[in-house]
């Protein structure tokens, strides 16, 4: 219906789709720098960190981590909306059996967490991932360990959109998506 609708591509809303096994193993030349970050994390913190599934008693610490993470970020509607969405998920966690939340503790302090759920039997969706940016390799570690532990058998991972945030876009592209799931808006003429 090209005469009736205008079609507008929404690049900022495209979802990033990845091969899950590549993110779990970080194997291959494309993932060399990510594997180096992960190995650096393991060398520095290997005997001081613990990955585990988070429970409701951990959620206040996760919110504090989000707040620490956001301290040096420009406040905008995306950050406010994300925090409200995370709080809502945490409040309703007992009614969301498909939702998985995992975190990395270093010296008993929560320094990274991620949460997601299954879109279908083959695809996990990662909604939120936060980590202390001062800790080298922590993002690579939470990405890898969360998938290994919570979604060990999915074939694909959807890490959602970048909202037009340049740093987020670069981070998502650095994990070499196999596809961008395009999104469009239709406007009636």
Where are these regions (language model features)?
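Conserved phosphate-coordination/catalytic loops
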Residues: 32, 80-84, 137
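A mid-sequence, solvent-exposed acidic-amphipathic segment
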Residues: 56, 62, 66-125
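Aromatic (often tryptophan-rich) hydrophobic motifs at membrane interfaces
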Residues: 98-188
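Short secondary-structure capping/turn micro-motifs that flank functional sites
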Residues: 58, 188-189
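Short loop/helix-cap segments at secondary-structure boundaries that form the rim of catalytic
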Residues: 1-2, 172
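Acyltransferase donor/substrate-recognition loop-hinge adjacent to the catalytic core
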Residues: 2-76
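A generic secondary-structure signal
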Residues: 40, 68, 91-92, 145-149
